[in-house]
């Protein structure tokens, strides 16, 4: 009965420890997943804000050129310099009446860029367009249209995914190392307890034998004295 109760207590403790470990790991993984989602949203917003900021700065630069009646070559040169950005595919300048004033040297037809003239389904997810008004003191001078590659943001997300996959792997390794360490400590403690118990039992047996020998010796002396 005592052994059954002891086994039940041990099984209950082991089950509680396992449930607690699973709960802790679940909470950690949930927190990591939430942090991953937040990082992805932050990276998307960062890329979007950066692209809008660069386009707005370029529009301010083109505003000065349009006010000074710059030539088409100057506008094209400015657009080519802007198109060297990693995410920019092409850019065009339109007047406030919608007339095309200049475009990049590697300008592609808008319909061709978006795949509207292609018999296949256009890949709208890979390209996006931003139209930024070009302001001056006189009002709207024109519009800047920029086609940029949305894969730039996806590349950032893929890097974040890769980093978090590494983090998941490290968490699993840490968990397994903790299990191994706990098992090793449990083994050595159990071995130490068994060894200590044997030594204690041997000492008790020796003391008992010594007492028995002393008792026998005194009994013999009493018999001899009689």
UniProtKB/Swiss-Prot annotation:
Its main location: membrane. It holds the Pfam family SMP_2. It comes from Pasteurella multocida (strain Pm70). The gene is ahpA. This is Protein AhpA. The lineage of its organism: Bacteria, Pseudomonadati, Pseudomonadota, Gammaproteobacteria, Pasteurellales. GO terms for cellular component: plasma membrane. Belongs to the Smp family. Keywords: Cell inner membrane, Cell membrane, Membrane, Transmembrane, Transmembrane helix. When anaerobically expressed in wild-type E.coli K12 confers a hemolytic phenotype, but not in an sheA mutant. Suggests it affects the expression of the latent E.coli K12 hemolysin sheA under anaerobic conditions. Disulfide bonds: none annotated. It is found in: Cell inner membrane. It is a multi-pass membrane protein. The chain crosses the membrane at residues 12-32, 169-189.
